[in-house]
């Protein structure tokens, strides 16, 4: 018996009907083979539109439904639920996007948009006739979560999940949690001491009964699927026993070796045995074997006997139900902007370096100085958008926090010494957050910070005084301005971590063109990813400030808690399937599979492919490569795809004749 198809065309207000003649599309659809009813409605996704579809299914005994509307990314689940409530399999729906594919791209050609919509509907009807029900598989979800990254995003997510009773493994590659926020002096717009508000959370997460900290460690491999991720972690040797070290510092006091301190961005020094900063969590010392001379003084000074020169890397294997990626960011490499002389001129520094200077616990005791001579600068110039909004260095995006960083540090400099002249050379001041515009006005009106709209072309150094000549066109005044500065601060942008591609491949995630992790939907699913059970948070997803980072971390914790709370997850089995009678065992499909989901068994004297339908993600690579057609992707079988193409071409011929 031939399937009975119903076609439902949505106006989407004027988004579709303003360009596409929806009534003509309906009239065309009514005449297609197998179509027993076709209807239009202004908003098919609204309750009246949904009821229209349900009533038509019952009245006309429909067993296939075609909806011509907007993007399936947003509304396909809505219509699947609709036909399911009417008694049909949710997989007997074929969704046609006539908004993005017709009205939006042909908005100046009503006839062309309408014809294209007709052709797409014709193809959809042919495919709908061949749709199949898709089975579902229920997997148990382990009530535990791996969080990659121990910055404020990872800490907040860990606390939220731990408070709900879930086991959390918080992995941080540095010796201490805290991330970038731990390096800051104060936070805008409230000027809170950064560590004063961060440290209590660091201590809370370390002492939480449901949170296990795994610091100085990196994720090396991730396999499996939602509910059952198998994770391999390599914990680097500290050469200090974490369970014995008391953090007293006696070892560092006798260590004769001093090297640049990475936490202070090289502005200060640390010993070969060290903690990154005084409030580090865990407060456990680490020996830097690249610089340790094995003199043994630390071992002699250590009362508890915690030094372990023979410590080896440790492999940790975990099974978790969900994962949150919160790996943070790196500061843009300002040496790539050669015209600004960073790394060449001593008195050109970055915002983060200034943060460490201004921090009372930093290398200069909270005093901004000129690196060339240690003197206090009396004229400071900030240059904005260094590594942001700059196609020349491949950074098209705005880093979002640099303007506020500069405003904060400019005010702090003026607070330390009101006589200091501070200039900010900017393209646009983007003070978008709550209280940010008022903060901007305060810098202008209360502190007298001077703003020059323009991007400096270059910086030159006076070789004798080490002063810097900043030449910039003030686009508001229409004139060239030269400033002789004691110190230049580059507002370096936020760059994705260089190992993001490696981690993305490991997790099965995508990266945006800018190198940050890609969300499932930028507006409706900003913390979810294409892999069920894996969420993203903080600057791993894209540049953002601390409030947005914390909010997104809480959102990610909420997202992964849902399947853990339910204890199980339904997987729709749109997976590869094998026709064993046709399979020749050539093994081409296994070579194409990125998930190692295909194995082979011997049957009737030759090899036959087998698919692990849980490991398989339904990408279709194997089906596309199979020379015999034995490997098919359920719901996207060859005949289903070809029938759609045939339907489009036949309709095109009919409309053109």
From Swiss-Prot:
Keywords: 4Fe-4S, FAD, Flavoprotein, Iron, Iron-sulfur, Metal-binding, Methanogenesis, Oxidoreductase, Repeat, Selenocysteine. [4Fe-4S] cluster 3 binds at residues 583, 586, 589, 626. FAD binds at residues 149-172. InterPro entries: 4Fe4S_Fe-S-bd, 4Fe4S_Fe_S_CS, FAD/NAD-bd_sf, HdrA-like. GO terms for molecular function: 4 iron, 4 sulfur cluster binding; CoB--CoM heterodisulfide reductase activity; metal ion binding. Residues 235-266, 283-312, 574-603, 607-636 form the 4Fe-4S ferredoxin-type domain. It holds the Pfam family Fer4_9. One of its GO terms (biological process) is methanogenesis. Binds 4 [4Fe-4S] clusters per subunit. It comes from the Archaea. Signal peptide: none annotated. It comes from Methanocaldococcus jannaschii (strain ATCC 43067 / DSM 2661 / JAL-1 / JCM 10045 / NBRC 100440). PROSITE patterns: 4FE4S_FER_1 (PS00198), 4FE4S_FER_2 (PS51379). Belongs to the HdrA family. Pathway: Cofactor metabolism; coenzyme M-coenzyme B heterodisulfide reduction; coenzyme B and coenzyme M from coenzyme M-coenzyme B heterodisulfide: step 1/1. [4Fe-4S] cluster 2 binds at residues 255, 292, 295, 298. It is an enzyme of class 1 (oxidoreductase). [4Fe-4S] cluster 1 binds at residues 245, 248, 251, 302. Part of a complex that catalyzes the reversible reduction of CoM-S-S-CoB to the thiol-coenzymes H-S-CoM (coenzyme M) and H-S-CoB (coenzyme B). Its EC number is 1.8.98.-. [4Fe-4S] cluster 4 binds at residues 593, 616, 619, 622. The ferredoxin:CoB-CoM heterodisulfide reductase is composed of three subunits; HdrA, HdrB and HdrC. This is CoB--CoM heterodisulfide reductase iron-sulfur subunit A. Its cofactor is [4Fe-4S] cluster; FAD.
């Amino acid at each position: 018996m031939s399937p009975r198809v119903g076609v439902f065309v949505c106006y989407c207000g004027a988004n579709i009907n303003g360009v596409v003649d929806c009534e003509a599309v309906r009239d065309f659809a009514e005449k297609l083979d197998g179509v027993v009813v076709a209807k239009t409605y202004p908003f098919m996704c609204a309750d009246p539109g949904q009821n229209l579809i349900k009533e038509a299914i019952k009245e006309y005994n429909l067993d296939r439904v075609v909806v011509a509307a907007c993007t399936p990314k947003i509304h396909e689940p809505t219509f699947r639920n609709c036909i399911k409530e009417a008694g049909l399999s949710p997989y007997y729906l074929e969704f046609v996007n006539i908004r993005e594919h017709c009205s939006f791209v042909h908005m100046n050609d009503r006839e062309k948009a309408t014809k294209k919509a007709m052709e797409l509907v014709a193809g959809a009807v042919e495919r709908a006739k061949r749709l199949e029900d898709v089975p579902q598989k229920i997997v148990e979800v382990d009530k535990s979560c791996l969080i990659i990254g121990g910055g404020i995003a990872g800490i907040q997510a860990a606390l939220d999940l731990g408070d709900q009773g879930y086991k959390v493994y918080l992995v941080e590659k540095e010796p201490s949690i805290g991330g970038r926020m731990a390096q800051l002096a104060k936070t805008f717009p409230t000027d809170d001491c950064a560590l004063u508000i961060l440290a209590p959370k660091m201590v809370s997460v370390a002492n939480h009964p449901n949170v296990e900290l795994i610091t100085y460690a990196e994720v090396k491999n991730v396999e499996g699927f939602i509910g059952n991720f198998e994770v391999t972690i390599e914990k680097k040797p500290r050469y200090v026993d974490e369970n014995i070290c008391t953090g007293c510092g006696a070892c560092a006091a006798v260590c004769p070796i001093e090297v640049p301190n990475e936490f202070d961005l090289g502005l200060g020094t640390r010993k070969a045995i060290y903690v990154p900063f005084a409030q580090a969590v865990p407060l456990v010392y680490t020996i830097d074997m690249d610089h340790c001379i094995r003199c043994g003084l630390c071992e002699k000074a250590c009362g508890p006997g915690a030094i372990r020169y023979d410590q080896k890397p440790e492999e940790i294997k975990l099974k978790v139900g969900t994962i949150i990626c919160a790996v943070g960011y790196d500061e843009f490499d300002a040496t790539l902007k050669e015209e600004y002389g960073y790394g060449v001129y001593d008195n050109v520094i970055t915002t983060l370096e200034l943060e460490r200077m201004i921090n009372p616990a930093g290398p200069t005791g909270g005093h901004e100085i000129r690196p060339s001579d240690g003197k206090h600068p009396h004229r400071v110039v900030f240059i904005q958008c260094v590594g942001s909004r700059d196609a020349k260095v491949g950074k098209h995006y705005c880093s979002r926090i640099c303007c506020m960083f500069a405003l904060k540090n400019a005010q702090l400099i003026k607070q330390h010494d009101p006589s200091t002249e501070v200039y900010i050379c900017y393209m646009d001041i983007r003070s978008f957050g709550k209280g940010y515009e008022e903060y901007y006005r305060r810098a202008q009106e209360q502190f007298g910070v001077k703003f020059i709209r323009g991007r400096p072309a270059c910086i030159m150094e006076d070789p004798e005084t080490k002063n810097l000549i900043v030449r910039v066109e003030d686009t508001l005044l229409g004139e060239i301005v030269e400033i002789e500065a004691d110190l230049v601060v580059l507002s370096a942008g936020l760059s994705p971590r260089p190992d993001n591609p490696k981690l993305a491949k490991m997790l099965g995630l995508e990266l945006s063109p800018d190198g940050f992790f890609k969300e499932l939907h930028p507006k409706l699913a900003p913390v979810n990813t294409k892999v069920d059970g894996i969420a993203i948070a903080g600057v791993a997803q894209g540049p953002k400030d601390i409030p947005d980072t914390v909010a997104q971390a809480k959102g990610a914790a909420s997202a992964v808690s849902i399947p853990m709370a339910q204890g199980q997850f339904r997987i729709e089995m749109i997976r590869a399937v094998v026709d064993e009678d046709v399979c020749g065992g050539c093994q081409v499909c296994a070579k194409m599979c990125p998930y190692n989901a295909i194995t082979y068994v011997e049957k009737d004297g030759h090899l036959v492919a087998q698919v692990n339908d849980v490991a398989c993600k339904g990408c279709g690579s194997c089906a596309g490569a199979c020379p015999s057609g034995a490997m098919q992707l359920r719901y996207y079988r060859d005949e289903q795809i070809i029938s759609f193409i045939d339907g489009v071409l036949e309709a095109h011929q009919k409309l053109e004749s």
